[in-house]
Swiss-Prot record:
Entry protein name: Disease resistance protein UNI
Species of provenance: Arabidopsis thaliana (Mouse-ear cress)
LRR repeat segments: 510-532, 533-555, 557-580, 581-603, 604-625, 626-652, 653-676, 698-721, 825-848
Repeat in keyword set: yes
Family membership: Belongs to the disease resistance NB-LRR family.
Region (Disordered): 131-152
Name of the coding gene: UNI
Miscellaneous comment as given in the Swiss-Prot or TrEMBL entry: The gain-of-function mutant uni-1D (T-DNA tagging) exhibits bushy and severe dwarf phenotype, due to altered shoot architecture caused by enhanced axillary branch formation via the cytokinin pathway. Uni-1D plants exhibit constitutive expression of pathogenesis-related (PR) genes through salicylic acid accumulation. 'Uni' means sea urchin in Japanese.
Free-text domain note: The LRR repeats probably act as specificity determinant of pathogen recognition.
Domain of life: Eukaryota
């Protein structure tokens, strides 16, 4: 008898089973829905990408994304994650299906999964339909940026645009503006601040803080807290750390701009509580300072320098301050006003103050008097000591170190607007004792260059190329004002350089004079006596003196520096020179001195002696008695490096640097002397063949001139075969210190491939050498392709080279090249340039003679190169380049 099985099922259970199997068909349509979900999700991601691109473009234009767009993007991101999770288990879920996908082995599990897929598909479809935005952004609400009052400016428009654009770059979080006092940094900064009001609410808050010198962190925190409405009594009683926490808490959720005006040292943002600007938070910190060094400490290693105004802009500003009423009162006043404006050298502070002072002066005589005061003692000009010099003096005070301050004041001894030769300036400093007691010239000079860098970064001096610096005229007046004890001791520094004097100026109290500079005048004779018992520096260079009276120097026992250079007719030193017992620096270069006085041997402290281009000096006999001598220059002197001279020089045991001319027979130099040579001139060697490989032993050689000599090539080091003489270790250059090279009238030389081993060349001049066909020969440099020449070259001068066809066989980078001069080189048709060769093309010039009459006279690497450098070709003119004729600057 068969058995029977009976099961009772409730209606609710039957309904649930029915819904699983039939109601929504989640299982039956699972595979179809999965395929649809994948397609719809791909479409959604594409739409999402388009929307994000639109948002990015609009936000770059300082628009703000719509809230609905942000909500949609958030939902898409959430759905995308959910979809990836669902699809990751698809293979497992499909394995559960049976009956051709109409049913499942695990009905409830498949039902739940199918339902999730169906609902997600509907959500994705909905998002796809909602993603068609007509607008994704809107103008931001205007943030509350209170405009700062500013005066109309002239000549700062380009600088404002450049500074604003740089600050708004995504990769720039910190930006510094640096420049000398009174140059207009704060005015420019205010205009940048006010532009934030123009662009609306791109930033949540813009904070302006005047920092000034010596400000404490607590004061900065208080100023910032007031802007953030934090500064109540409870907050004021907190310590700096807690205040920083509060400031950070408020700012970290905001897109802020912090503008710090007039900082003198690094501002510790973290200690204040400022979140560090980044590409993520898109915040900005901007500041002004007088110090480039501070810019680096703050994290801006490419700060923007605010410079003085160009002459025409300066004149416009000055005219505005003086006013049309005064300028039109007499036609002569306009010309006199131009002269006064020029005295300000483009410094807005001076232009504003002096322009306002002169605005009521309607008589020609008043303007003539003003010019006279400027020329004789500018510090006495009305308002100069009240409104201009004290502002500039802050930079001087910030130097701190008294030696650096002395170095700065020393620069005021040079003429207005005159370029100062760095190395000679530092040698003066060394002898004056400003640099310390280091007896090693190289170390002392290195320290001097560090001090020079400090003055340059403080914007008290301006760098001019590699070899020179210059002091702004108004800064110079400030230095002279300080040196005179603020006008109380005007004869501390007697400075009348480059003013056309024909005689020594009258001095009331010679005993008060510490420094005297009468350089660059027309003084022919000194007839007065002086009792300069305190004088330490006497500059008489570049006059028309024929001698120096003994009576004039009799009382100068403290004189340390005496410069008589460039008195072309000067032929005799008095025997009273022996009384200058403190003398350390004596420069007689470019004079007609015929012999050294017997009393010279009494100068026991003399350490620097320059006899460059003393072409009438026949002997330096007795120089070996100058036992303290550390530097001797004989380049271009009639005294050449013959056996008798070298014998004397070998006795100078403290000698550290030698500049000398070698001619006639090649003398085998003492090894110690060879290492001391820094500047060498070789002339009149007509041997054939001639080998200058001995130069490689001169490890301190910085300047080399070869003239009227006969040799085919310079061998850097001995090698196994003639053909491989350049195949040496390129990591050990032969001429590491060589920075200046002149080759003149060397008619056997065909190339200068050996200069590959002079990686620090700054100046290269090749002149009147008829066989030179290329500068660097490709075949000889075959194994040296890893060496890139001319990376530090600033001046390339090629004169009268009839066979020259090539400088280098392919384009080269010239990172710092300023000028390329090519004259009478008819076969040179292509320069080693491409479109990326020179980074600062706006500062680069090519001078060619004869000038190319048509564009196709020169061959270019490509059209981009041609278009980039054609504007750089300028009319030919004669220059005196640094390094030409060595130290004749």
């Amino acid at each position: 008898m068969g058995s029977c099985f009976s099961l009772q099922v409730s209606d609710q259970t039957l309904n649930r089973i029915f819904n699983c199997l039939i109601g929504k068909s989640y299982i039956r349509t699972l595979e179809k829905n999965l395929r649809a979900l994948q397609r719809e999700m791909e479409d959604l991601r594409a739409i999402q990408h388009e929307v994000q691109n639109k948002v990015a473009r609009d936000e770059a234009r300082h628009q703000r994304r719509l809230e609905a767009v942000q909500v949609w993007l958030d939902r898409v991101n959430s759905v995308d994650i959910e979809c990836k999770d669902l699809l990751s288990v698809t293979p497992v879920e499909l394995q559960k299906l049976c009956l051709c996908g109409l049913c499942s082995k695990y009905v409830c599990s498949s039902y739940k999964y199918g339902k999730k897929v169906f609902l997600l598909l509907e959500e994705v479809k909905k998002l796809n339909s909602e993603g068609n935005f007509d607008e994704v952004s809107q103008p931001p609400p205007r943030s509350e940026v209170e405009e700062r009052p500013t005066q109309p400016t002239i000549g700062q428009e380009d600088m404002l645009e450049k500074a604003w654009n740089r600050l708004m770059e995504d990769g720039v979080g910190i930006m510094g503006l640096h420049g000398m006092g009174g140059v207009g940094k704060t005015t420019l900064f205010k205009k940048i601040h006010n532009k934030f009001a123009e662009i609306g609410g791109t930033f949540d808050i813009v904070i302006w803080i005047v920092v000034s010198k010596g400000v404490m962190i607590s004061k900065l925190q208080e100023d910032i807290a007031e802007k953030l409405h934090l500064c109540d009594d409870l907050w004021k009683n907190k310590n700096e750390s807690d205040k920083a926490t509060d400031i950070h808490r408020v700012l970290k959720g905001k897109r802020f701009v912090l503008m710090l005006d007039d900082i003198w040292e690094k501002v510790d943002l973290e200690a204040i509580g400022i979140p560090y600007p980044s590409e993520v938070n898109k915040c900005k910190v901007a500041f002004t300072t007088r110090s480039r060094e501070v810019c680096g400490e703050m994290g801006d290693h490419k700060p923007m320098q605010v410079n003085c105004l160009e002459p025409e802009d300066a004149w416009e500003l000055f005219k505005n301050k003086v006013g049309d009423n005064t300028l039109s009162s007499d036609p002569v006043i306009v010309e006199l006003a131009r002269e006064v404006a020029q005295k300000c050298r483009g410094l807005p502070l001076a232009l504003n103050v002096i322009g306002e002072t002169m605005s009521s002066k309607t008589m020609v005589q008043e303007w003539e008097h003003a010019i006279h005061v400027f020329n004789t003692s500018a510090a006495e000009f009305s308002d100069m000591q009240n409104k201009i010099l004290p502002i500039l003096k802050y930079s001087y005070d910030s130097l701190g170190d008294e030696h650096i301050k002395s170095c700065f004041l020393y620069c005021a001894l040079f003429p207005e607007d005159g370029e100062i030769y760095n190395e000679k300036l530092i040698d003066y400093w060394i002898c004056e004792g400003f640099i310390g007691e280091d007896q090693v010239i190289k170390r002392a000079r290195n320290k001097g260059y560090a001090m020079l860098g400090t003055l340059t970064r403080a914007n008290l001096l301006t760098k001019v190329g590699t070899y020179y610096c210059v002091m702004h005229d108004v800064v110079r007046e400030m230095a002279l004002w300080i040196a005179s004890d603020f006008g109380k001791q005007k004869e501390n520094f007697v400075v009348q350089a480059g003013v056309g004097l024909h005689e020594i100026p009258k001095v009331k109290d010679w005993g008060a004079v510490r420094k005297m500079s009468l350089m660059d005048n027309d003084i022919e004779e000194i007839t007065c006596e002086s009792k300069c018992s305190e004088l330490t520096t006497l500059f008489l260079q570049s006059n028309k003196l024929k001698n120096l009276p003994g009576a004039f120097i009799r009382y100068m026992q403290k004189l340390v520096v005496l410069d008589l250079s460039y008195n072309r007719d000067f032929n005799k030193l008095p025997e009273q020179i022996s009384g200058l017992v403190s003398l350390q620096f004596l420069d007689l270069s470019n004079t007609s001195i015929e012999h050294m006085p017997i009393g010279l041997k009494e100068l026991k402290k003399l350490t620097f002696l320059d006899l460059t281009y003393t072409d009438r000096l026949c002997s330096i006999s007795g120089i070996s008695r100058l036992l303290s001598l550390r530097l001797l220059r004989l380049l271009g002197s009639k005294v050449h490096g013959d056996a008798s001279v070298l014998k004397e020089l070998q006795q100078l045991q403290n000698l550290q640097e030698l500049a000398i001319t070698v001619s006639a027979e090649l003398i085998s130099l003492d090894q110690r002397l060879a290492k001391l040579i820094s500047n060498l001139c070789i002339e009149g060697f007509l041997q054939k063949p001639f080998d200058l490989s001995f130069l490689a032993s001169m490890e301190n050689l910085s300047s080399l001139r070869v003239e009227n000599s006969y040799f085919s090539e310079i061998k850097c080091r001995e090698s196994e075969t003639e053909s491989s003489y350049l195949r040496i270790n390129p990591k050990i250059p032969c001429f590491t210190n060589l920075s200046r090279l002149e080759i003149m009238k060397c008619h056997s030389m065909k190339d200068l491939t050996w200069i590959l081993f002079a990686p620090n060349l700054v100046v290269l001049l090749i002149e009147d050498s008829r066989e030179v066909g290329e500068i660097i020969n490709k075949e000889k440099a075959t194994n040296l392709t890893s060496i890139t020449p001319f990376l530090k070259l600033e001046w390339l001068i090629l004169y009268n080279l009839p066979k020259l066809e090539s400088i280098y066989w392919s384009p080269l980078p010239f990172p710092v090249l300023l000028t390329m001069d090519v004259s009478n080189c008819p076969k040179l048709r292509k320069l080693p340039l491409n479109a990326t060769s020179v980074s600062k093309v706006e500062e680069f010039e090519i001078h060619m003679y004869p000038p190319p009459e048509q564009e196709n006279e020169l061959e270019w690497e490509d059209d981009d190169t041609k278009n980039r450098f054609l504007p750089s070709i300028k009319p030919y003119k004669y220059f005196v380049y640094p390094g030409m004729s060595f130290l004749t600057v």
